[in-house]
Amino acid sequence: MNHVSAVTFCVNEELEAKLGLTIDSYEDLLDPALKGQILISDPNSSSAAWNNLSNIMAVYGTDSDAAWDYIAKLMPNLVIVGSSSACFKSVQQGEYVCGLTYEDGVATLVKDGADNIRIQYPVDGTSASGFAAALIKNCPNPDNAKAMIDFICSAEGQTAMTAYQGGTLRFTNENTEFAEGSVLPASSEIKWVPRDVTYLTENKAAILEHWNDLYAAVVG
């Protein structure tokens, strides 16, 4: 695994200020002023949305009554969109106040000059999904492939990649040096919560069925 992507909110600070809100926790998302103002993609087809649903489970208890009670309260404020990138692009464009999304998507917009949005890690805690590099069995040049994987997982390689892409990815080597002006905060500055990946993976179909049934009952 060479980098991870943390669950975040993308918050339009101008619209947030107009509403007189401070959005930094899951409870803040329940404000009635945010009805129809929070974007999420469809967890049935979007890994970004599934990760956000998984993080709610991590904060409130995996597949617990407390988690589902929270989700039921949140659903009236949600707008489900077909594209995970819309959850930060449409917020940056001023169409919505908040998007439930992933850090590197928002970070890329910020790096490119978007100054009306922020990456908000929920103060309740966040979790991340991992991205791996793998050696293909019986590949023609395994030694070269191994050397490449070793490099991109090394502090030297990840420091070079951080400098190249402007600090918009969270690399996994603890000795990676952040480039000057990196958009993302250090992992040590973030509150992390453990995600029960085994349970969520084994019960994904049932959890999504629960989500779909609940959404139909709450929103129609």
Predicted regions and their residues:
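Periplasmic-binding protein-like
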Residues: D69-L74, I80-V81, G113-C139
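Mature extracytoplasmic/periplasmic domains
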Residues: T126-S127, F131, I136-R195
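Short secondary-structure boundary segments
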Residues: E13, D42, E103-D104, Y164-Q165
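Conserved C-terminal helix/tail region of periplasmic/extracytoplasmic solute-binding proteins
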Residues: E189-G220
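Extracellular/periplasmic catalytic domains that process cell-envelope and extracellular macromolecules
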Residues: M1-V4, D31-A33, Q92-Q93, K111-D112, ...
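Extracytoplasmic ligand-binding site segments that recognize negatively charged/polar headgroups
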Residues: M1-E95
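A ligand-binding cleft/hinge motif common to bilobed small-molecule-binding domains
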Residues: Q92, V97-N116
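Non-transmembrane alpha-helical segments in soluble domains
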Residues: E27-L30, M57, A72, F88, ...
